[in-house]
Amino acid sequence: MKALPFPCRPAQDRVLEALPQMGGILSGNDALRGAIADGLMLKDPGAAYYAYECSGEPGRVTGVVAICPINVLTGSDEAAAENVDALAAARAIAELKVQPRPVSLAYEASPVMDIILGAAKEGASLYAVTDPAGITHRVWEVKREDAVAAIRAMLDQAPEPALADDPAYATALTGASQLLADEARAAGTYTGKEPFNFTVAALFPAAQVAGAAPQVPTGLLTHQIARF
């Protein structure tokens, strides 16, 4: 499985201000650009993985957030592909040019990965927010070169992950990717390396999630899929 580090997130000291506004910030490209200009949302200059912990009922689970090729979502629910809401969501994501939250995937984690993420969690968290349901979401940035290399090596050895999210959301992401790819091909600029060919994913150990995995809050970790 190929999973790369990535940048894009709210300003650390303004996350509690940003999250309640995500409905407006992610309502359109102009609103998002305004939030970036205001310093509410950041585009990190460097690339990093993120350790993500969700704690509450029924327990605690830790995943790693990374960029994966969009084809990891291939084979999502065919019925969802015909869903009118999913098609509308795909168009909205393509117009916004940003993936609003990571898609949740389940993968075969290794004990070494547990050690790496455990070490990352010993430091101060980048974010720690509790939602109205009482679920606490914590995020740690992993950007030390040796840690990034170790995580990348572990993920390179892992089998392809399985979808552990709403099939309609996965379909919307693949649909947005296809719409933007079609536009690039029509313009004669398609290379295959564009950011819309990748998706930001929260990868959770399959042994810790049954069926649906936790969802990272909308706007907490996003992915710009095309130029504004």
Annotate each PLM feature:
Residues M1-P161, D166-F228:
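Surface-exposed, charge/polar-rich loops and edge strands
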